[in-house]
């Protein structure tokens, strides 16, 4: 199993030339082959950046995706109303005055309207390219299956999927097939991103799910069973499980600690590494870590991707030592609270800020664990 003491969630800031090329491709001004050349070059560069920073775990920065969760609808037919706001909707908040709050409406036509038909893999090609360009641990991120629960609509989806459970069964099957293929290709570390669980600490988001007929306890139980069905499809593979509170354009969705969800999630999910958000007071304290089973590692997301603030090795080590009062030091790691760019709309920091933060994580891990 992967035991690295330095990790980052996955997404990295897209360089301006890649974003410009994506826009030109969408406008029909750039041939797909030329875009692929630019995209491949950007991925090679971001791999080199992580290696130079000392990262033992590397990703492709999610550079080939519109959003961390967009590959399901990009690779599988059957959805309608999908645009960038499908991944950005919600009431977003910021602690920085110049960023401010923002509300993005859910696309009104967003729904599954046909039976799912897989056209290509979600991440197998990403992994193959990544593995061929690094000798570090190559990590692939995938969305938790129940992130897509909101795409089932009792009216618009009923012809394709009269029952919600039937839709979710197909989503789970797609993701199970994907992790099996990743495992076959040699992937040793995959991560499920599950930001929808911490949303349940917020009354408004609880009401959203309860309006669909689920109590919080029922929803957590259902979701964890779905996650475990995906994780259990690839025995021997290390799985990370990332839990944050929303991260987009340096904004967040909810505030509060993990207290209300820690027992069912930390103890119930079959993941080997829990990547948790702990970069500010909004994230709550370390007390819920006492509920982490002894066979799991915790990646403390102490380094923020939302602001340029330069964390120091001293402060990070102090917080790691504090967490070690609840979880054995050897089962801890240090990382980011979330990605640097969970969609093509990245956080409001510079590429230099990103590099410095990755270097600080690697140096801190070396200082604490050797």
Which role does the model predict for each range below?
Residues 1-370:
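Domain-level signal for soluble alpha/beta catalytic cores
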């Amino acid at each position: 199993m992967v035991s690295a003491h330095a990790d980052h969630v996955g997404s990295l800031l897209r360089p301006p030339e890649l974003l410009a090329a994506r826009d030109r491709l969408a406008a029909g001004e750039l041939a797909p082959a030329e875009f692929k050349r630019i995209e491949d070059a950007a991925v090679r560069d971001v791999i080199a950046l992580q290696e130079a920073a000392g990262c033992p775990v590397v990703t492709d920065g999610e550079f080939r995706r519109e959003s961390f969760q967009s590959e399901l609808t990009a690779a599988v037919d059957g959805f309608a109303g999908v645009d960038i706001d499908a991944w950005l909707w919600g009431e977003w908040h910021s602690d920085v005055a110049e960023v401010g709050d923002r509300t993005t409406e859910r696309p009104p036509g967003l729904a599954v309207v046909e039976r799912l038909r897989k056209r290509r893999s979600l991440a197998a090609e990403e992994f193959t390219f990544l593995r061929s360009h690094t000798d570090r641990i190559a990590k692939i991120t995938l969305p938790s299956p129940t992130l897509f629960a909101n795409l089932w609509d009792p009216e618009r989806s009923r012809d394709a999927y009269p029952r919600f459970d039937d839709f979710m069964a197909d989503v789970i099957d797609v993701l199970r097939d994907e992790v099996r293929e990743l495992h076959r290709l040699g992937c040793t570390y995959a991560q499920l991103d599950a930001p929808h669980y911490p949303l349940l600490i917020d009354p408004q988001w609880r009401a959203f799910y309860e309006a669909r007929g689920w109590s919080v306890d029922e929803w957590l139980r259902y979701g964890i069973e779905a996650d475990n069905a995906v994780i259990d499809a690839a025995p021997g593979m290390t799985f990370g499980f990332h839990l944050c509170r929303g991260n987009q354009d340096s904004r967040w969705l909810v505030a509060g600690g993990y207290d209300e969800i820690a027992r069912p999630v930390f103890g119930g999910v079959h993941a080997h590494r829990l990547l948790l958000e702990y970069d500010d007071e909004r994230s709550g304290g370390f007390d819920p870590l006492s509920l982490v089973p002894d066979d799991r590692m915790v990646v403390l997301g102490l380094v923020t991707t939302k602001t340029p603030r330069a964390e120091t090795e001293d402060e990070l080590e102090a917080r790691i030592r504090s967490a070690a009062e609840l979880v054995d030091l050897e089962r801890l790691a240090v990382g980011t609270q979330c990605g640097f760019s969970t969609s093509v709309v990245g956080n409001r920091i510079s590429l230099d800020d990103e590099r410095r933060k990755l270097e600080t994580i690697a140096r801190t891990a070396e200082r604490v664990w050797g």
